[in-house]
Amino acid sequence: MHLYLIRHAHALDGDNDAARPLSPKGRKQVRKLAGLLRHTKAFETGEIWHSPLRRAHETAGMLAKGLKAGARLKEVAGLTPDDAVDRIAARLGDLRRPVAVVGHEPHLSALASLLVAGHAAPPRFKMKKCSALRLDRADGGWAVRWHVSPELV
């Protein structure tokens, strides 16, 4: 099973954190990431989960469109920056198909650390805006397959 953890792209500043849209820079980041993943065939999923925050929803939507893979978007509770990672980790452990999760820091780093190292703190990963991390599950555990940061795209 493959799991893709993707941090939302760069967003505009604003007073209402939940409503902050992607910036032009962020939109460019997502287009480039989607292009790389499509070109290298490094991404396979039918579903992209995202937090209820606008910047994550927009990142997920642009990613799905750019990948041209027909992935469905699904807003999922438990993916905001301050949410505990145990519930979402348990939910991911029950999955039998690849899924992508578009979320936020420090949540994604804590989630990746919990899945790979068995504990969320201190985080073992740093997810920059519009970075992607692929984890593969085998033999009851998770392992890092690859990581793409915005500087590489």
Predicted regions, residues:
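Hydrophobic/basic alpha-helical segments enriched in Actinobacteria
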Residues: 43, 47, 67-70, 88, ...
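Mid-chain, well-packed structural core segment of small domains
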Residues: 75-110
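Generic recognition of short, well-ordered alpha-helical interface segments
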Residues: 55-58, 106, 139
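Active-site-proximal alpha-helix that buttresses catalytic centers in soluble enzyme cores
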Residues: 2-86, 119, 127-130, 153
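Domain-level recognition of soluble alpha/beta enzyme cores
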Residues: 119-153
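Residue-level signal for well-ordered alpha-helical positions
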Residues: 62, 114-115, 138
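Non-DNA-binding regulatory cores of transcription-related proteins
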Residues: 98-100, 105-131
